[in-house]
Amino acid sequence: MKPGIHPEYKKVIVRCACGNEFESGSVKDELRVEICSECHPFFTGRQKFVSAAGRVDKFNKKYGLK
């Protein structure tokens, strides 16, 4: 690596839209994110599963398959 051409990597505070803050590393001074592990549905357990069973039943009914 050439000296003096790389940006300085430093610790920064990452702020989420939900109000959560955590520390990470970046070359930027400040990071803002819309969603984090504290408010994302996958991590909070509020995830909704979309069931395709209704569409499959409709297809089978339409084409006479079992």
Curated annotation (Swiss-Prot):
Mind telling me which GO cellular component terms the entry cites?
A: ribonucleoprotein complex; ribosome
Cysteines engaged in disulfide bonds, as pairs = none
Which note does the record give on the cofactor?
Binds 1 zinc ion per subunit.
What's an example GO BP annotation here? Answer: translation
* Amino acids binding Zn(2+): 16, 18, 36, 39
Q: Which InterPro entries match?
A: Ribosomal_bL28/bL31-like_sf (IPR034704), Ribosomal_bL31 (IPR002150), Ribosomal_bL31_A (IPR027491), Ribosomal_bL31_sf (IPR042105)
**Molecular function, one GO term:** rRNA binding
Domain of life the protein comes from: Bacteria
Metal-binding keyword on record:
yes
Q: Which cofactor does it need?
A: Zn(2+)
User: Would the keyword Ribosomal protein turn up in this protein's UniProt record?
Assistant: yes
Q: Give a single Pfam family match.
A: Ribosomal_L31
Keywords from the UniProt entry: Metal-binding, Ribonucleoprotein, Ribosomal protein, RNA-binding, rRNA-binding, Zinc
Q: What does this protein do?
A: Binds the 23S rRNA.
In terms of HAMAP family, this protein maps to: Ribosomal_bL31_1
Please give the family membership noted in the entry. Belongs to the bacterial ribosomal protein bL31 family. Type A subfamily.
NCBIfam families, A to Z? L31 (TIGR00105), PRK00019.1 (NF000612)
- What does the subunit comment say? Part of the 50S ribosomal subunit.
Annotated protein name in UniProt: Large ribosomal subunit protein bL31
What species was this sequence derived from?
Answer: Geobacillus sp. (strain WCH70)
Q: Which gene encodes it?
A: rpmE
